[in-house]
């Protein structure tokens, strides 16, 4: 399952994501991962969640992010949910075909490995393509 939370900067996406993380901690029985661009949410995310500061790595494209996620999962098969805050900013790109392909890859990975993905992206909902719309 892939879920996108979309909206412009300041629309409450990260706040909603934090609420969903807290709900997941209470309701899910596996491990939870949260990837953010910087370490600014260290005190907002429960300590049970594996918090990853993406600025410590060179996330220079979706292929790297796919490999990183695959590596996380191969090291810990108990991961049930991966949250990514502002995935476009982590990669450093706007919404494009590569982003759409990444979301589809996450969907297929999630089905195969029983992992949920919840991500935020900072774009106007009206600019979402059909391939993006199915995730929110």
Question: Where is each model-derived feature located?
Answer:
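Conserved P-loop
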Residues: 1-71, 128-130
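Generic beta-sheet signal
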Residues: 3-5, 32, 79-84, 117
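Short loop/turn elements that form and flank the Walker-type P-loop nucleotide-binding site
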Residues: 28-29, 45-47, 76-78, 112-114
């Amino acid at each position: 399952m892939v879920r996108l939370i979309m909206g412009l900067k300041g629309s409450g996406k990260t706040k909603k994501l934090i609420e969903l993380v807290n709900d997941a901690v209470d309701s899910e029985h596996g491990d939870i991962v949260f990837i953010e661009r910087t370490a600014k949410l260290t005190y907002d995310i429960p300590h049970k969640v594996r918090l990853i500061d993406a600025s410590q790595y060179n996330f220079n494209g979706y292929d790297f992010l796919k490999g990183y996620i695959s590596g996380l999962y191969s090291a810990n098969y108990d991961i049930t949910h991966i949250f990514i805050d502002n995935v476009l900013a982590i990669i450093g790109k706007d919404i494009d075909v590569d982003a759409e392909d990444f979301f589809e890859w996450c969907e297929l990975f999630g089905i195969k490995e029983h992992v949920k993905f919840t991500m935020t992206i900072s774009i106007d909902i009206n600019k979402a393509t059909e391939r993006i719309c199915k995730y929110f």
